[in-house]
């Protein structure tokens, strides 16, 4: 039985995790961490890690600052962490990598298996089409999402750009530029509205045809499932920095 601590337990993803884990027999929630102390059913919730009396794998769905705090607490106390928050800066990501030298850190801005397959397909399409086709990414999310573009859109863009040896320049806004599209532009567009859980389209646009790779999340349960799988995966691993690619490919990065 794997014990799990959820940071951001009051949020949408926190509630989805409570529902998913409650139906499982291989793990359990021993505590939550959020802005205010309280309870969710039988689960105690603490207002910060300093008050936490128990141990377990930390799953973080909170904020950039919360993600760093979780990783640093995990590193100081030997607790594995699954970091799912988006909007992290380069400095935040560096802090996660530093923490991974002392405890297992699993990092993904999108815990969906399908999205990560989409990323692999985008890599392959870039290898075949990238020299002749323009590439655009369109992401859609609910009206309450704070960051734009989404962390997933940036994951896709980074995967494409790595495959293309870093030749692309990300373009988020064309309203101030009156000129033709540059050959090395990679456009990223964000849509916010209603209750859209998450949709990502990658367009490879040629002169006479368009290839579209698309993923749509039907509910937040898909992200909760992935986060739980990640928590079970890293629970007994050595310190290191792990990603969804490691989980999907079954690779263990242990030194």
Predicted regions and their residues:
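Short glycine/serine/threonine-rich phosphate/pyrophosphate-binding segments
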Residues: 12-17, 66-69, 115-118
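Rossmann-fold NAD(P)-binding glycine/threonine-rich loop
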Residues: 71-72, 76, 85-106, 116, ...
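Rossmann-like NAD(P)-binding element
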Residues: 51-69, 75, 79-84
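Short glycine-rich anion-binding loops that position phosphate/pyrophosphate groups of nucleotides
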Residues: 64-65, 87-88, 110-111, 193
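C-terminal substrate-binding/catalytic lobe of Rossmann-fold NAD(P)-dependent oxidoreductases
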Residues: 3-52, 131-255
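Rossmann-fold dehydrogenase core element
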Residues: 80, 95-112, 130-135
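Short, hinge-like loop/turn segments at secondary-structure boundaries
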Residues: 45-49, 98-103, 122-125, 153-156
């Amino acid at each position: 039985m794997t014990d799990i601590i959820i940071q951001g337990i009051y949020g949408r993803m926190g509630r989805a995790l409570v529902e998913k884990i409650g139906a499982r027999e291989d793990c359990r929630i021993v505590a939550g961490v959020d802005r205010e102390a309280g309870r969710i059913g039988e689960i105690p919730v603490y207002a910060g890690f300093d008050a936490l009396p128990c141990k377990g794998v930390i799953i973080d769905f909170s904020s950039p600052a919360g993600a760093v705090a979780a990783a640093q607490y995990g590193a100081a106390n030997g607790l594995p962490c699954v970091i799912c928050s988006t909007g992290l800066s380069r400095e935040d990501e560096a802090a996660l990598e530093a923490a991974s030298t002392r405890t297992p850190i699993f990092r993904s801005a999108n815990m969906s298996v399908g999205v990560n397959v989409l990323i692999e397909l985008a890599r392959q399409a870039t290898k075949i089409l990238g020299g002749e086709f323009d590439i655009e990414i369109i992401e859609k999310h609910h009206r309450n999402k704070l960051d734009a573009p989404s962390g997933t859109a940036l994951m896709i863009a980074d995967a494409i750009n790595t495959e293309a040896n870093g030749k692309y320049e990300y373009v988020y806004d064309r309203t101030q530029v009156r000129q033709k599209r540059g050959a090395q532009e990679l456009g990223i567009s964000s849509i916010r509205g209603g209750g859209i859980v998450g949709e990502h389209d990658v367009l490879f646009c040629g002169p006479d045809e368009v290839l579209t790779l698309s993923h749509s999340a039907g509910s937040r349960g898909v992200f909760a499932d992935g986060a739980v799988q990640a928590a079970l995966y890293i629970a007994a691993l050595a310190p290191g920095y792990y990603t969804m690619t490691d989980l999907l490919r079954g690779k263990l990065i242990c030194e």
